[in-house]
Every structure is written in C-alpha cells, then in structure tokens.
Amino acid sequence: MIIATLAQKSAMASQYSDYGVSVTWWCVDEERTEAAASMNAVLRKAILDDETVNPVGDINTVITEEMLAKVTEINITTSMDATGLTLDGLDLCTNLTKLSINAWQVSLGDIDLSAFTKLTDVTMSPTAGYTSIQLPDGIKSFKSIIKYANHEPVGPTTLDLTQYTDLEYVSVMDSYGEPAALKSLNVSGLSKLALLYVGGTPEVNIANCPLLTTCIKNN
C-alpha cells in the first residue's frame, strides 16, 4: 500500500502499471463520506482498529459504506476500554458473521440480534451481564460468560434457546462461585446441539437433544 496525495497518485500510478505491478493507494486528501456517525464509539474504534477493514490505521478516522461492507467480525475484549459500550449502530454491519463482546464491568440491556441473517457465532459476555437476548435464526455457536467482579450482573436470569434449531455449541458460565444470576437454561429439542458447557446455573433442560453426548456442568 502507498499512502499519498491524489496528485502523487496521478503522477506515479502509470509507472507501476507499465511494469505490471499491482499497487493499493490510500490518498490522504481524497474525500470520504462518513457512513457510521451514529455508531457507538467503542464499536467504531473496534472497526477502525481492524487492519482488514482499515489498513492505514490512525491515518483514517472515517468509516465508509465500503468499509462497513468488509466488517465480518467484531471483537471487544476485556483489555479494551469499553466504557459506554452499547450496540447502537451495529445494524450497519450487514455482513457480520461473528460478534464477540467480552467487556469489563459493562452491562447491556435487551439485546436483539435477530435481524443479522449472516451472524452464526455470538459471544455475549459483558462482565456485568445483560437483561435478555434474541439471537439470529441461523446461530450455530453461542457463548455467554458472566463474571462477578466487584459488581452485580443485571442478568440474564433465564435463557431459552429452544427456537435456535441450528445451534451446535453452547457455553454458558455464570457467577464463578457466587450465587448465579442465571437460574435456568433450556436447550431442549435442539437436534444439532453436540456440545454444551454449563456453569453455575441450577436448572438445565437438555431433553431431546439426540447429538448431545457431551454436557459439562460445573457447579
């Protein structure tokens, strides 16, 4: 990649073409239209820090439609400053296939991911929990790990995953030794579920899961 001005690109591009050399140009003075102004600041930073989406890093602070189309994964880790995290603007990432939220001392409310038709892998683990969650119909992997770390989680208190018939893997851990916020987990009737990890939840319904040969429950 060559970072240059439009004038420099105009003057030099033909030289590379003449020698059959493929070059990606980033023109610092090229006008770019912001397409994610309404997006939560934490999500924006995660996208701008993704080199596959924004290869020039801090040089660019604009998220364009073209960049949004390239976003297939968003990963918020506990090492990041996730203060003020919401999922506002996440719907702009229409090609999202994987979402991982591991945010320290963050709680989220009612989460609705049902419109994300390409999303198959979700980790929803803000350490202070979330109220409820709706997943996409095509979800295959779901992880939810809620930790007590000098704060009380807001939930969830129940998880009924029975409508998500493509689920193959579920990992739900809660509390790490404290009384669990999650009181019940229902995965009954999931014909594709093959692996289940559960921790801290007193009631788990695994009836009629024909492929489920491994269910690891830690109290």
What are these regions (language model features)?
Residues M1-Q105, D110-I146, V154, D160-Y169, ...:
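N-terminal capping/linker segments that flank leucine-rich repeat
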Residues G199:
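Active-site lining segments of carbohydrate-active enzymes
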Residues G177, L195-L196:
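Tandem repeat scaffolds
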Residues Y148-P153, S175-P179:
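Intrinsically disordered, low-complexity Ser/Thr- and acidic-rich flexible linkers and loops
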